[in-house]
A protein has these predicted regions:
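N-terminal accessory/interface modules of nucleic-acid-binding and processing proteins
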Residues: 1-155
Length: 155
C-alpha cells in the first residue's frame, strides 16, 4: 500500500506540472475538473490522470446508499490520497458513474453541475479576490489559469 501511495503522490506532482505548463493541457484538465468541483485540486489531478472522461465520481458507499446504484463487476476504482484520517495518509477509491448501474426502479442519476453565463463574471471576481489576482482580459478562462498557477505554486 505504501508503494501505491507513493505512486499517487508522484502522479499528483507530475500531473500538476503538466497542466500548469501547457494551456492546452490546462483546458483539458478544466473540462474534467468542472464536473468534479467538490473534490480538492490534488484529487481532481488524480481523477484527470486516471479517468479524464469522468463525469460524476463518488465512493462505493455513496453510490450504494444515497444513489441506489451498484458498482459494475470488474470496475476499477480511481485511487485518491486520503489525508483526513490523522497523521497517516492512505488511499481511498472513487468510481465514475459509468462504472455503476441503477438498482431496479430505485436508482438515481446525479445532478451534474453547469454554469450559466451570468455566473462567469461573478466567478471571475470571486477568484480574483480569493487569490489576490489582477483583473485581466480573457474573462473567467484567464482568471482560472491565473488561480491555477497560484494553487500549483502554493501546493
Amino acid at each position: 500500500m505504501a508503494n501505491k501511495l507513493y505512486e499517487m503522490q508522484k502522479l499528483t506532482a507530475d500531473v500538476s506540472r503538466d497542466v500548469a505548463a501547457s494551456p492546452e493541457e490546462w483546458m483539458k484538465f478544466l473540462d474534467t475538473a468542472a464536473r468534479l468541483y467538490r473534490y480538492t485540486f490534488p484529487e481532481q489531478l488524480l481523477i484527470y490522470a486516471k479517468r479524464p472522461e469522468a463525469t460524476a465520481v463518488a465512493s462505493m458507499e455513496i453510490w450504494n446508499k444515497r444513489m441506489y446504484r451498484w458498482i459494475n463487476r470488474g470496475s476499477r476504482g480511481i485511487a485518491l490520497i486520503d489525508n483526513t484520517s490523522g497523521p497517516r495518509m492512505k488511499l481511498r477509491y472513487v468510481f465514475d458513474i459509468q462504472d455503476t448501474h441503477k438498482v431496479k426502479n430505485l436508482g438515481r442519476d446525479p445532478k451534474l453541475w453547469e454554469m450559466i453565463p451570468a455566473g462567469e463574471q461573478l466567478s471571475a471576481e470571486y477568484l480574483q479576490n480569493q487569490f489576490s489576482l489582477e483583473e485581466v482580459d480573457g474573462g473567467l478562462a484567464e482568471t482560472l489559469r491565473q488561480a491555477a498557477r497560484e494553487s500549483v505554486q502554493e501546493w
